[in-house]
């Protein structure tokens, strides 16, 4: 059975991707900051819910290493993201830092955890989604 590790699985693309892969015979490791938001995902066959906050480097290491110790992961899907709305010039610094900590640094730290695994097994895929917010304005 193929296995995919998905970040940001509590809503949106991550949630729907979890459903898709689970319904097509894959094992899905669905990660999210708040596992209580898993809802019906926890009832799907072959779905494993794990906590993962991309602003927490220690949790990134722990969750990634737990998943890799228990499952032979084929695909890493970096999907989690932090969104901001409003005029750029009015965005507070702490919100900008949260965005970079999640979308850039957190994503890079997760990816670092999986590269040795994929090298050792001589295969694997890393997918990363981005937001249209980098292309279009999202006024408040």
Question: What spans do the regions from the language model cover?
Answer:
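Residue(s) in the substrate-gating loop at a strand-loop-helix junction
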Residues: 131
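The beta1-alpha1 cofactor-binding region of Rossmann-like NAD(H)/NADP(H)-dependent oxidoreductases
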Residues: 52-62, 93
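A short, exposed helix-loop element centered on a Lys and neighboring polar residues
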Residues: 111-112
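Conserved NAD(P)H cofactor-binding loop of Rossmann-fold oxidoreductase domains
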Residues: 79-84
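Conserved glycine-rich cofactor-binding loop
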Residues: 10-11
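Conserved glycine-rich Rossmann-like NAD(P)H-binding loop of the short-chain dehydrogenase/reductase
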Residues: 24-39
